[in-house]
UniProtKB/Swiss-Prot annotation:
Catalytic activity: beta-D-fructose 6-phosphate + ATP = beta-D-fructose 1,6-bisphosphate + ADP + H(+)
GO cellular component terms, semicolon-separated: 6-phosphofructokinase complex
Residue stretches spanning the membrane: none
Pathway membership: Carbohydrate degradation; glycolysis; D-glyceraldehyde 3-phosphate and glycerone phosphate from D-glucose: step 3/4
Native source species: Cytophaga hutchinsonii (strain ATCC 33406 / DSM 1761 / CIP 103989 / NBRC 15051 / NCIMB 9469 / D465)
Active-site residues per Swiss-Prot or TrEMBL entry: 128 (proton acceptor)
Binding site for substrate: 126-128, 163, 170-172, 223, 247, 253-256
Summary of activators and inhibitors of this protein: Allosterically activated by ADP and other diphosphonucleosides, and allosterically inhibited by phosphoenolpyruvate.
Cofactor(s) needed by this chain: Mg(2+)
The keyword Nucleotide-binding belongs to this UniProt entry's keyword annotation: yes
Enzyme class: transferase
The name this protein goes by in its record: ATP-dependent 6-phosphofructokinase
Length: 328
């Protein structure tokens, strides 16, 4: 193996630049030529390849976003699009790929490998922490810290005005951000996709948890698949308990921004190195992850098809500290 190419795809996550940096530096350490593919699969199709040396990735470990940009590619979904991408891979003489992203990224990489046998090792880059094969994903810790900073500020105004705040965080299919943010922010409840929402449970908890000395509450809501989910839930509660002053805050894309935390920088650096060394060991069609502090490699098909369960220890911690389960 002489040449590798690195790309980011799908939703951005803090720490992607740290992972790019690590992959590039690891490649040069092992005497490889390293290219970056700008704008993910679209860039692969259009031949948007740039050579990356160590200087090109200096001073990026602390930056959010991705210097290689990211884009969702409809064309790559088609056999014709993937053929164009393969032609560009051959043109530049690329022997192996490093893919940084989530489920969509690895679905594309799986298809591409099955058709053209270009070795690819992935690194999990998504704030949702929803990928099977790694305890944590790049960007998750930073996103939780971003949420926590907002929760702490909202708690101040919620207490001052004795309000109930529903704070919506990202997480379409999983409640990892919601649960960890709720625990670290001392929230009274978290509503997550793993468990069916029951408005009567929320109503009863608020009814029995509100008193003359405790009238403010913070409820964290994972966005799920329904747009404006926190607003919908807030309306349910307001109709049932009109005496409560209910407010909604949607944190949105602020969770994806900002410089990565120390934990994400270290995680991304470990995974960037692991992708390159995985390629050199002859691995292909796998994602590098960290489980129990050790590097592991999981087939893309498993990361795509297997569901990563919510951490039961986190749920147990929340229940014991809060006196109630998050299973609402």
């Amino acid at each position: 193996m002489k040449k590798i190419a690195v790309y980011t795809s799908g939703g951005d996550a803090p720490g992607m630049n740290a992972c790019i940096r690590a992959a590039v530096r690891a490649g040069h350490y092992h005497n490889l030529e390293v290219y970056g593919i700008v704008r993910g699969y679209d860039g692969m199709i259009n031949g948007n390849f740039i050579e990356l040396d160590n200087r090109a990735v200096s001073n990026i470990i602390q930056k959010g976003g991705t210097i290689l940009k990211s884009a969702r590619s409809e064309e790559f979904r088609s056999p014709e699009g993937r053929r164009k991408a393969f032609d560009q891979i051959q043109k530049f003489g690329i022997d192996g790929l490093v893919a940084i992203g989530g489920n969509g990224t690895f679905t594309g990489a799986e298809l591409f490998y099955n058709e053209y046998q270009i070795p690819c090792v992935g690194a999990p880059g998504t704030i949702d922490n929803d990928l099977y094969g790694s305890d944590f994903t790049i960007g998750y810790d930073t996103a939780v810290n971003t949420c926590l900073a907002a929760i702490d500020k909202i708690r101040d105004t919620a207490d001052a005005h004795e309000r109930v705040f529903f704070i919506e965080v990202m997480g379409r299919d999983t409640g990892y951000i919601a649960v960890r943010s709720a625990i670290s922010g001392g929230a009274e409840m978290a509503i997550i996709p793993e468990f069916p929402y029951d408005k009567n449970v929320v109503i009863n908890r608020l009814k029995h948890g509100t008193s003359d000395t405790k009238a403010s509450h913070i409820i964290i809501v994972a966005e799920g698949h329904q747009e404006g989910r926190a607003s919908m839930i807030a309306r349910d509660i307001k109709e049932a308990l009109p005496q409560l002053d209910c407010r909604v805050t949607t944190l949105g894309h602020v969770q994806r921004g900002g410089g990565p935390s120390a934990a994400d920088r270290v995680l991304a650096s470990r995974l960037g190195l692991a992708t390159v060394e995985g390629l050199l060991e002859g691995r292909a069609n796998v994602m590098a992850g960290i489980i129990d502090h050790k590097v592991v490699y999981t087939p893309f098909i498993d990361t795509i098809t297997k569901r990563k369960p919510i951490n039961e220890d986190l749920l147990s911690l929340a229940e014991k500290l809060n006196g109630r389960s998050y299973k609402v």
